[in-house]
Amino acid sequence: MPATQEVTRVRTPRRENHEVLATVSSLLGSKRVTLQCMDGVVRMGRIPGSKNKKMWIHEGDVVIVAPWDIQDSKADVIWKYTRPQVEWLERKGYLK
């Protein structure tokens, strides 16, 4: 029997929407987190109400964020990666 490969579909940040990868540094409460973004900026992230109950975020999680146009020090959390997706991102060189 040949070994089957598991296919992992991973959403990557979209450059046209100015999305970046980030790691959650700390939880601030009230749907807010501190993020260490891959572009070198520390941002205050906001979890939108539509994703609040669906997406449980903890320290150390890797997420996609969209920085605000008005204030670059703040961002909205768009997507949270699972552990197999984070491993795939590391293998492909998206995470440093």
UniProtKB/Swiss-Prot annotation:
<dbReference type="InterPro" id="IPR006196">
    <property type="entry name" value="RNA-binding_domain_S1_IF1"/>
</dbReference>
<keyword id="KW-0396">Initiation factor</keyword>
<dbReference type="InterPro" id="IPR018104">
    <property type="entry name" value="TIF_eIF-1A_CS"/>
</dbReference>
<dbReference type="GO" id="GO:0003723">
    <property type="term" value="F:RNA binding"/>
</dbReference>
<comment type="similarity">
    <text>Belongs to the eIF-1A family.</text>
</comment>
<dbReference type="GO" id="GO:0003743">
    <property type="term" value="F:translation initiation factor activity"/>
</dbReference>
<protein>
    <recommendedName>
        <fullName>Translation initiation factor 1A 1</fullName>
    </recommendedName>
</protein>
<dbReference type="Pfam" id="PF01176">
    <property type="entry name" value="eIF-1a"/>
</dbReference>
<dbReference type="InterPro" id="IPR001253">
    <property type="entry name" value="TIF_eIF-1A"/>
</dbReference>
<keyword id="KW-0648">Protein biosynthesis</keyword>
<feature type="domain" description="S1-like">
    <location>
        <begin position="8"/>
        <end position="82"/>
    </location>
</feature>
<comment type="function">
    <text>Seems to be required for maximal rate of protein biosynthesis. Enhances ribosome dissociation into subunits and stabilizes the binding of the initiator Met-tRNA(I) to 40 S ribosomal subunits.</text>
</comment>
<dbReference type="InterPro" id="IPR012340">
    <property type="entry name" value="NA-bd_OB-fold"/>
</dbReference>
